[in-house]
Amino acid sequence: MARISGIDLPREKRVEIGLTYIYGIGLSTSQKILAVTGINPDTRVKDLSEEEVNEIRTYINKNLMVEGDLRRDVALNIKRLVEIGSYRGIRHRRGLPVRGQKTKTNARTRKGPKKTIANKKK
């Protein structure tokens, strides 16, 4: 079982796809990792030798921020924005979209379920 950065990679998938199970590694990053380490992207995770797994692990530890470190970094960045009172920080605090999307009709993912208000009698 290949275990990298505290994540068990799925055995039956190709290495290229298996690496994307690690938080902070997408498809393009996994392709770059495999190109640098010289491992065939079509190889299945179960077919990797221990030496190849160690190469991947070493490259990730030296060059990338993944999993807990990356999550902590993102959380600290958001916390900093909230503390300094920037526009983006205020949007985070209120639970609204941060990147300029309209909120009159959409933004249900960020705002949560619709809160209906009872109509006033005439």
Swiss-Prot record:
Give the intrachain disulfide bonds. Answer: none
Top-rank taxon, per record: Bacteria
- Span list, region Disordered: 93-122
* UniProt keywords, alphabetically: Ribonucleoprotein, Ribosomal protein, RNA-binding, rRNA-binding, tRNA-binding
Stored Gene3D superfamilies: 1.10.8.50, 30s ribosomal protein s13, domain 2 (4.10.910.10)
Q: Which GO terms describe its cellular component?
A: cytosol; small ribosomal subunit
Query: Is tRNA-binding given among the entry's keywords?
Result: yes
> What's a single GO BP term from this record?
translation
Q: Is DNA-binding one of the keywords?
A: no
Query: Which GO molecular function annotation, any one, does this entry have?
Result: tRNA binding
Q: Which family does it belong to?
A: Belongs to the universal ribosomal protein uS13 family.
How does the annotation summarize its subunit structure?
Part of the 30S ribosomal subunit. Forms a loose heterodimer with protein S19. Forms two bridges to the 50S subunit in the 70S ribosome.
Q: What does this protein do?
A: Located at the top of the head of the 30S subunit, it contacts several helices of the 16S rRNA. In the 70S ribosome it contacts the 23S rRNA (bridge B1a) and protein L5 of the 50S subunit (bridge B1b), connecting the 2 subunits; these bridges are implicated in subunit movement. Contacts the tRNAs in the A and P-sites.
Q: What is this protein called?
A: Small ribosomal subunit protein uS13
Write the gene name.
Answer: rpsM
